[in-house]
Amino acid sequence: MPTCFVGEKTDLRLMKNQLSWTLPTILVLVGGLLLTTGVTSAPAQNTSPKRVLVVSTTTGFRHSSIPTAEKIIGELAKQSGAFTVDYARVEPNDPQFKGADGKPDAAKVKAAITEVLAKKMSVAALKNLDAVIFANTTGNLPLPDPQAFLDWIKTGKGFAGMHSATDTFPGFPPYIEMIGGEFKTHGAQVEVTAINQDAQCPACRHLPANWTVFDEIYQLKNFDRNKVHGLLTLDKHPNDKSPGDYPIAWIKEYGQGRVFYTSLGHREDVWDAQWKDGKGERKNSPAIAEAYQQHILGGIKWALGLEKGDARPQTAVQ
């Protein structure tokens, strides 16, 4: 019969107690090591959708594609589940604005725009938003406080602009600084092949190295490539094909905020894969419209901080 000494029993108890607290400690340490080395699942994120305001009011030229833009952005929000949308919009052709001559009464339309923006873009209202989208806005919009809006973006909010967002607040340097450029002119609508400058960015990673699209291509002023991260560009004039640098889309940081802009979006068939004109024709295939939708969805999600992307300025076309 084996002999068991009291000291051995004590040692066994001690070892058992040590193991009882050492094992959890080891697990915690290993877990911490995995976190620091990235060998773990993605951290849990707030699953609540972001809140986005789509602004489509205009005091200048009004694009016929605005209703299509509003619809597509709403569909992208619903399909992605990443964000919800509210709208700041006024349709000038609404019967309530009809004047004695049967045309929209400019004073009534302006008053309605002012009222809508006062409600949707007040300092108090902005506090409840994560991003604002300017969908083909034009002219000097009667915001309650334009500078407060820009300051709001700087605090870490998002901004996305499509097409004529650069033809908004013309001659207002703070806004132009925020968005990154200002509309100068455009030629006839034309087919162009855009160079994809960043295939890793969520706004461009689904696009080929050279992407062909038919649209109205803006030429810009007050644009500095050293202050933006280029996404899409042309290396020749869209119409006369002379060599040059013609930016189409970019992202940039603005304070702590994030800004995405694309000059594409003039035509309905750029936005909507199902759209057809009165003759049942379209210049852009459904596939191009679907690619454009992913382009703006990626840009919006980047602006919301939901997708990663390098926003460091580039000094030359890649």
Please place each PLM-identified region on the residue numbering.
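Structural recognition of the beta-strand scaffold that forms the well-ordered cores
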Residues: 53-55, 85-87, 130-135, 153, ...
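Extracellular ligand-binding/catalytic regions of CAZymes and related secreted enzymes
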Residues: 45-50, 56, 64-67, 71-80, ...
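Glycine-rich, highly charged phosphate/nucleotide-binding loops
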Residues: 94, 100-125
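A glycine-rich, often tryptophan-bearing local segment used as a flexible ligand/cofactor-contacting loop or short
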Residues: 125, 134, 138-206
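Catalytic beta-strand/loop cores that center a nucleophilic Ser/Cys/Thr
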Residues: 84, 117, 128, 181, ...
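Bacterial N-terminal signal peptides
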Residues: 24-38
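Solvent-exposed loop/turn segments at secondary-structure junctions
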Residues: 58-61, 91-94, 137-141, 159, ...
